[in-house]
Design a protein with these regions (language model features):
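Charged, amphipathic alpha-helical segments and their flanking helix caps
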Residues: 47, 57-65, 125-142, 146-151
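Internal glycine-rich alpha/beta core junctions
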Residues: 2, 21, 73-77, 87
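A structural signal for well-ordered alpha-helices, especially hydrophobic packing surfaces
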Residues: 24, 31, 38, 57, ...
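Conserved alpha-helical segments that form or flank metal/cofactor-binding pockets of metalloenzymes
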Residues: 41, 45-84, 155
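Disorder-to-helix initiation segments
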Residues: 2-23, 101
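Amphipathic alpha-helix face/heptad-repeat signature
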Residues: 16-26, 30, 56, 104, ...
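Helix-loop segments that flank and shape redox-cofactor active sites
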Residues: 8-15, 30-55, 122-133
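Acidic/histidine-rich alpha-helical segments that form the ligand environment
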Residues: 69, 83-140
Length: 157
């Protein structure tokens, strides 16, 4: 942990960093799952899902950097190994064998909903710490994952 004089006390920064690292881990696992599904999707909806999954994993890839850099900006370190991400994540990693396309959609929907809940918890922690920058980042993450969840949910109806 670095010494900072930015108006956030060290305990608050630690709590926010821990919460952000949880969101980061879930984002990383969901990114990997989405990317694997992009590679392995088959069936009549192949092209639609292949393109959609690519848009989703590219968006999450960019978000990973933003979240990790926020953790660094408040004086803490981001997880740096697959094991660390797996230990922190609430989302299950990609399946050993690719599921059918319909199950991929359901699995991703569940992952996005889990991530939304996790980001809301982190948002509350950032709010208690008066960390407006982390609140802004988390608000955008919630909005993005809610929109993606809506689109995935619409494909299951």
């Amino acid at each position: 942990m670095e010494k900072l004089n930015t108006g956030l006390d060290s305990n608050s920064r630690k709590a926010v960093a821990d919460a952000l690292n949880g969101v980061l881990a879930d984002t990383y696992v969901l990114y990997q799952k989405t990317h694997a599904y992009h590679w392995n999707v088959t069936g009549p909806q192949f092209h639609t899902l292949h393109v959609m999954f690519e848009e989703q994993y590219r968006e999450m890839w960019a978000a990973l950097d933003e979240i990790a850099e926020r953790v660094r900006a408040i004086g803490h370190f981001a997880p740096a190994s697959g094991k660390a991400f797996a230990d922190l994540a609430a989302i299950d990693s990609a399946d050993a064998k690719p599921p059918a396309a319909a199950q991929m959609i359901k699995n991703l929907l569940e992952g996005h909903e889990t991530l939304i809940r996790r980001a809301r918890e982190a948002l509350d922690i950032a709010g208690e710490a008066n960390d407006a920058a982390s609140e802004d980042l988390l608000t955008v993450r919630i909005q993005t994952h809610e929109k993606t969840a809506w689109m995935l949910r619409s494909m299951t109806e």
